[in-house]
């Protein structure tokens, strides 16, 4: 017996990816096969994982932010959604005609939004930083311009936002199989940080985690191995940083390192390697040796 079935498959965007006819040859007698072991399927509600962070802001006033060069869909929609959620008061800095063109194309409501018209991305970065320096906004958001373009204005000695502490970047990673958000630093600003730079990078990340509701962040200082090796600088830095934390030179967090990536985020891996640590397998913050390795992790 032959069965003919029309067959059509669409992808997540509703586009047809398979179209044809399936011919099935029906067996003439009953066939039994052993049950196959199926992989475990986990459904992760990504928005749910961030609700506790948003919940912390419910009684706070929205803060003014400058959005530098929001000239594509994502960088324009994001601050408008944050405005609608009562989180921010966006100030859009960029070519007004281009911003309005994107808004009209994508149905983004700009009513009541302040737009500062500047000719190009470099002027957007310069103006956004000036607004922050003058206290007109409390935060900066990068739009559709290169990170270097914005950061060159931020770190300018004359007109930037320098403080006594070194600037650093933190990724907030959504890992479905990890029980809480994971902060990764620094994978965007400091290319090859020194030991002194790493002190600032760690302190910045600890204070951010505390602001996010983590009372004593667990900080894993990553390297290729979990033992100190004089030929691997990152292991020496990790050991020194942990001792500096013991001496109060880094405050507010619980540090351990060097730790390889697997035993920083997996209790099973840490136990297998015989690592006894309050940080291993349950880190809140991953401190990477340099920008390259940080980008690979994040």
Residue spans for each PLM region:
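HotDog/MaoC-like acyl-thioester-processing domains
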Residues: 2-45
């Amino acid at each position: 017996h032959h069965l003919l079935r029309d067959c059509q498959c669409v992808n997540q965007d509703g586009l047809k990816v398979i179209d044809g006819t399936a011919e099935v040859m029906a067996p003439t007698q009953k066939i039994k096969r052993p049950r196959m072991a199926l992989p475990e399927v986990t459904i992760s509600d990504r928005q749910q994982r961030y609700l506790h962070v948003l919940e912390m802001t419910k009684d706070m006033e929205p803060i003014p932010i400058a959005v530098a060069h929001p000239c594509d869909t994502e960088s324009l929609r994001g601050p408008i959604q944050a405005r609608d959620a009562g989180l921010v008061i966006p100030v859009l800095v960029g070519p007004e005609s281009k911003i309005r063109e994107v808004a009209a194309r994508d149905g983004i409501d700009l009513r009541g939004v302040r737009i500062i018209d500047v000719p190009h991305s470099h002027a957007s970065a310069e103006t956004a930083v000036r607004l922050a320096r003058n206290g007109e906004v409390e935060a900066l958001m990068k739009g559709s311009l290169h990170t270097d373009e914005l950061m060159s204005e931020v770190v300018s000695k004359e007109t930037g936002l320098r403080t006594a502490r070194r600037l650093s970047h933190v990724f907030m990673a959504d890992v479905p199989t990890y029980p809480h958000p994971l902060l990764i630093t620094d994978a965007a600003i400091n290319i090859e940080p020194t030991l002194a730079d790493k002190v600032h990078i760690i302190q910045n990340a600890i204070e951010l985690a505390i602001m996010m509701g983590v009372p004593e962040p667990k900080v894993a200082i990553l390297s290729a191995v979990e033992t100190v090796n004089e030929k691997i600088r990152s292991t020496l830095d990790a050991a020194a940083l942990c001792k500096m934390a013991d001496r109060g030179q880094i405050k507010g967090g619980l540090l351990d390192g060097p730790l390889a990536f697997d035993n920083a985020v997996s209790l099973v891996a840490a136990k297998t390697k015989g690592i006894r640590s309050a940080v291993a397998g349950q880190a809140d913050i991953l401190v990477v040796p340099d920008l390259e390795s940080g980008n690979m992790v994040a």
